[in-house]
From Swiss-Prot:
Family matches, as InterPro entries: Papain-like_cys_pep_sf, Peptidase_C92
Record's function text: Contributes to vaccinia virus virulence in mice but not to replication in cell culture.
Encoding gene (name): OPG091
Taxonomic superkingdom: Viruses
Protein name as annotated: Protein OPG091
Pfam families: Peptidase_C92 (PF05708)
Key words, A-Z: Host cytoplasm, Late protein, Virion
Source species of the chain: Vaccinia virus (strain Copenhagen)
């Protein structure tokens, strides 16, 4: 199953979606294993939406299909507590319009997710890089509170059976 249909069918609001693109200007400078992340907001007026932060547009909301344009691989993670995830998804809307960056009053994609979940009561560890605390994909994927529910490179049989109910 492709990631867009998986998310539309199974992912709860607040799921975090990691993607890698076939071509990215920042991928060589980015120490994250997964190069981009967004928060699945859910549906609004029948449209599935993702909140992300990009270097060109800052924090914005985009249709799920647009989020996946040009993607190479995808992973989706969730927490056990769906209510916490909903709070994080709602928080993401309050950050719309913040410019992209690493300084004060700036937001890059992994910080967006970390801040939304911090507001929901879930602290995320960071890495100290060049004197700054930076959030990377590994800060989420290596944290056992996060459950991987989809991996486009490795859809295992137990996941297929689990998803069938």
């Amino acid at each position: 199953m492709d990631p867009v249909n998986f998310i539309k069918t199974y992912a709860p609001r607040g799921s975090i979606i990691f993607i890698n693109y076939t071509m990215s200007l920042t991928s060589h400078l980015n120490p994250s294993i997964e190069k981009h992340v967004g928060i699945y907001y859910g549906t609004l007026l029948s449209e599935h939406l993702v909140v992300e932060s990009t270097y060109r547009k800052g924090v914005r909301i985009v249709p799920l299909d647009s989020f996946f344009e040009g993607y190479l691989s995808a992973k989706v993670y969730m927490l056990e507590n769906i209510q916490v995830m909903k709070i994080a998804a709602d928080t993401s809307l309050t950050l719309l319009g913040i410019p992209y960056g690493f300084g004060h009053n700036r937001m890059y994609c992994f910080k967006l997710v970390a801040d939304c979940y911090k507001n929901a009561g879930v602290e995320t560890s960071s890495k100290r890089i060049l004197g700054k605390d930076i959030f990377l994909s590994q800060n989420f994927t290596d944290d056992n509170r996060w459950i991987k529910i989809y991996d486009s490179n490795n859809l295992t049989f137990w996941q297929i059976d689990y998803l069938k109910g």
